[in-house]
Every structure is written in C-alpha cells, then in structure tokens.
C-alpha cells in the first residue's frame, strides 16, 4: 500500500488520535510517501522484533488502563484522556474512555466502531480497505508484530534495546501532507508487552499513549468487544 494512512479522512484520523486509539492507539498509523513514490521496504526481522513476537505468542488477551496525552506543537496545548483497553490477538480491540466519558473504539471481526464527541460510526473493514488497514495496524502493534505493520505499509523499521524497554520505530520514508510520520512502540523487557506508543503526525500533533496495570490472560467482561446498537 503506497500511501500509509495519509489518505484517510482527517476526521477519522483525529478520532483515532484520540485513542488511543489509540492506542493505542492504540489504537495505529505511520504516514508514508505521497502516492506513486517508492518507499523502502522493512528489513528482515531483527533479534529484538523476533523476541517481542515470540513472547507475545502465548498471550491470549490483555486488559489494561491507558492514558493519552495529545500535544499540539503550534499552540503548546496538551489534552489528557484515559480509559480501559481490552484486547485479544485474533483481532478484537476495545478502548473504552472514562475521560472523556462515553468515547469508544471497538474492533470486532470485520467491524470497526468509533464514538467521538457523541458521533458514532461503524465501518465494515471487508469493504473499506483503509479502515481495515488501520484496524490491522492497531491490532498488530498491540500483539507485538510491528514487522507485519511495516511490511504491509512499506514503512521503515528500526528496533533496539534501551533502558526503557525494547523500542521499535516505524518511520515514513517520505512524509505525506497528512497522516503520521512516525510511530514509536515500547515493549517492556519483562514480558514484551506494549506499554507505550508515541504517534507523530505530520501536522505537528503528537499523541502519547501509555498502558498501565496490564493484565495478561485474564477474564475479560462478556461485553468487552460489543458494538453498541443504534
């Protein structure tokens, strides 16, 4: 896919940027070159990425608290949000906001639901390739498979071990006018679970998501991935 998220309507991008998606947003989401320009493919799997993927292979589900800090470079304004995240690696993700209350992001099968500012939208990802790509990006980042995200979007990938954790950076080879120029994922060393995601937009907005009180292989609420009916 020659264009990495920069063709998504900015109204939807701003909703995902409120994620968390996120999270992380977790919710997903690196800008790429303009359409028609070549973008370097991701390199072969690094030892760090291989370790992250292997460690997450035994994860059946995740529940965590998350915080989001949106920083607008031009004004210096900062907007804080928070909520609860539910995830299973087979393609289910919910980011349920407590602040602002009522905001919601759900990926469930081929459905992608968002509620932002009281406006609800549900997409069929089997018919909407862009939203399908975005859903896959979010899911694969959380499940510890950033290489699949990089390969699917022709983004550059770099991985390293730092004092903070295992850090994977996805970077657009040439930033478009819209979308994300970079995503930085931090997986904690103890079990390679995603604990931080920084998403940098080409327009000067940065969203930082942090996962706290992470529980793995736990009992999730029966309605964790339910999409609200109209």
Identify the meaning behind each predicted range.
Residues 28-40:
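Boundary at the C-terminal end of the N-terminal hydrophobic targeting segment
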Residues 43, 48, 53-65, 70-72, ...:
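Flexible, processing/modification-adjacent segments and terminal tails
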Residues 66, 93-97, 112-115, 168-170, ...:
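Short hydrophobic/aromatic-rich beta-strand segments that constitute the beta-sheet cores
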Residues 1-12:
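N-terminal secretory signal peptides that target proteins for export/translocation
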Residues 17-26:
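Bacterial N-terminal signal peptides
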Residues 148-230:
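Gly/Pro-enriched, hydrophobic low-complexity segments
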Residues 80-82, 101, 108, 178-183, ...:
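Short, surface-exposed coil-to-beta transition loops
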Residues 84-136, 207:
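An acidic-aromatic
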């Amino acid at each position: 896919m020659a264009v990495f998220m920069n063709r998504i309507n900015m109204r939807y991008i701003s909703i995902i940027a409120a994620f968390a998606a996120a999270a992380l947003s977790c919710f997903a989401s690196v800008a790429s070159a303009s359409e028609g320009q070549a973008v370097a493919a991701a390199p072969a799997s690094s030892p760090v990425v291989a370790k992250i993927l292997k460690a997450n292979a035994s994860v059946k589900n995740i529940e965590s608290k998350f915080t989001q800090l949106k920083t607008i470079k031009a004004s210096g304004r900062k907007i804080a949000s928070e909520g609860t995240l539910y995830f299973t690696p087979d393609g289910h993700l919910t980011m349920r906001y407590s602040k602002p209350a009522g905001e919601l992001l759900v990926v469930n099968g081929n459905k992608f639901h968002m509620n932002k500012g009281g406006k609800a939208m549900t997409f069929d990802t089997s018919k909407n390739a862009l939203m399908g790509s975005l859903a896959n990006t979010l899911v694969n980042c959380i499940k510890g498979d950033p290489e699949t995200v990089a390969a699917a979007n022709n983004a550059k990938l770099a991985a390293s071990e730092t004092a903070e954790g295992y850090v994977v950076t996805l970077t657009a080879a040439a930033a478009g006018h819209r979308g994300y120029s970079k995503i930085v994922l931090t997986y904690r060393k103890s079990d390679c679970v995603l604990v931080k995601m920084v998403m940098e937009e080409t327009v000067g907005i940065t969203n930082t998501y942090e996962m706290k009180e992470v529980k793995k292989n736990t009992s999730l609420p029966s309605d964790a991935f339910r999409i609200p009916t109209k």
